């Protein structure tokens, strides 16, 4: 299994792996996004779900209460101290059968105590990415829409997998927006 370069990512993007695709890394006046040497910095859209405790809900992944969130559409969002938000990528991904991705947070946000978690994109997964954003600080933290949030690294297996995410009809296949926990 090897990490894939900018050349490979560009070739695959032209075949529809990433839409829309920014062929160059955009850095001027924004938190960077677009193609990098060995990855792709995705952008966060302007759709956010911020955790709130207004309804005194308990977070239960088997019985998730949507009232645990406040939905926000904005150019930026404030994540409360020691809190959490969900968002989605601007980019839509179609992962090849012999590829697995890993997502890592951007250092600009990490240095401010904002941690991004995204599970791997499995072979033949497709959709908009639901992004998990944690504010680990005791202060409110700002996240900017339409700018970079995390970097996707692409790894190609030595051979295609036997059973892909599409084959097993994964529950998060073809996500069209922010998708909450499912069983």
From Swiss-Prot:
Listed SUPFAM superfamilies: dUTPase-like
Reaction catalyzed: dCTP + H2O + H(+) = dUTP + NH4(+)
Alphabetized InterPro entries for the sequence: dCTP_deaminase (IPR011962), dUTPase-like_sf (IPR036157), dUTPase_trimeric (IPR033704)
Organism annotation: Acidobacterium capsulatum (strain ATCC 51196 / DSM 11244 / BCRC 80197 / JCM 7670 / NBRC 15755 / NCIMB 13165 / 161)
Cited Pfam families: DCD
Catalytic site: 132
GO annotation, biological process: dUMP biosynthetic process; dUTP biosynthetic process; nucleobase-containing small molecule interconversion
Family named by the database record: Belongs to the dCTP deaminase family.
Positions that bind dCTP: 106-111, 130-132, 151, 165, 175
Function summary: Catalyzes the deamination of dCTP to dUTP.
Keywords: Hydrolase, Nucleotide metabolism, Nucleotide-binding
CDD domains tied to this protein: trimeric_dUTPase
GO MF entries: dCTP deaminase activity; nucleotide binding
Name the record gives this protein: dCTP deaminase
Pathway(s) this gene product operates in, as recorded in its UniProt entry: Pyrimidine metabolism; dUMP biosynthesis; dUMP from dCTP (dUTP route): step 1/2
Record-listed E.C. numbers: 3.5.4.13
Oligomer and partners: Homotrimer.
